[in-house]
Amino acid sequence: MIHCGICGSPKIPNVEFLCAHCINGSPSILLRDKLKLLLLRQEVEQLKHDVGEQLEAGFAGNGQFGKQLQKLDVYNEKRRLIKLRQRVQLVKNKIDVKRNRYQELERYLKDEDHFDKDKKVFDVEEIVNDEALTMSKLSQVLQRKQTALFKELCQWFRIEKCDEDVNNNNNVSAYTIWGVPMINLKYSNEMDRDKQVISMRYIHQFINFSFNIWLFEGISDVSIENEQNVIQNYSQLIYDTLRLLQVRKLVSESVSIRDILIRYDLDGMIYYLSKSKYLSSLDDASNSYPPTLQNIKQLVASMIPSI
């Protein structure tokens, strides 16, 4: 008979057998295993804490890992936007085909030499009306897709307005993009140069993607590599932002560029664009100072003369 090593003497030397009762209730075994379990839990918690700190540091964008993740995010978003733009372009092509057909039928309808009977006129008018209705529906589909895609883009870039307390403490910008304060003319000299370049690049990417969504060209394909030509960078971003605002009908066609820059600055223009809010400003009724790139450069140079 084999005896338990705790409540009895083992029959086989150097071999300890434990009965079920002692395994479940012996203080010496329970305490030892419980201490081991507590130590193991402490090690696991410490490992979790260390791993969490490493991940936070990596995802924060300060380290190499964070920078690579940001590049990967931009690459993935570009691929997704290219696919979506292709779909939007297909809808636009259908609209163009319908529009051309509509115009052709209108011309045919106005040419009285083609008609011998009233029935023929009625048939052509019916076709024209059907084509016009189809084109209107396709235009609505295109607009809905563009609006939804632009909304996703604004959410992805996290264009937000800072709290008043945070804004008063920073004294840089009231708005952020991807967690970085947005550049503006008012506080251009108070912002760190490295952050200024990062902010410019984020805004440049946002504008470039926006051009793809709304299907028209800008000068945003000119890359922003450094802070050497600040006036050129500011002017380029302001010019393209103003074009987007005009396409979205968020500013007057005869807007005064000086007045809108004084009221909103570049960061405010980007924020209002992301929220699809109308920017009220004075009009340049005489069109004496049109919003050309050259005029914007002169304005930027006069508003930040110390650069």
UniProtKB/Swiss-Prot annotation:
Sequence segments annotated as region (Cysteine repeats): 4-22
GO biological process: macroautophagy; protein transport
Record's bilayer topology term: Peripheral membrane protein
Cellular component, GO annotation: phagophore assembly site membrane; protein-containing complex; vacuolar membrane
Coiled coil: 36-113
Keywords: Autophagy, Coiled coil, Membrane, Protein transport, Transport, Vacuole
InterPro entries: Autophagy-related_protein_14, UV_resistance/autophagy_Atg14
Localization annotation: Preautophagosomal structure membrane; Vacuole membrane
UniProt-listed Pfam families: ATG14 (PF10186)
UniProt remark on domains: Coiled-Coils at the N-terminal half are essential for autophagy.
Protein name, as recorded: Autophagy-related protein 14
Annotated organism of origin: Kluyveromyces lactis (strain ATCC 8585 / CBS 2359 / DSM 70799 / NBRC 1267 / NRRL Y-1140 / WM37) (Yeast)
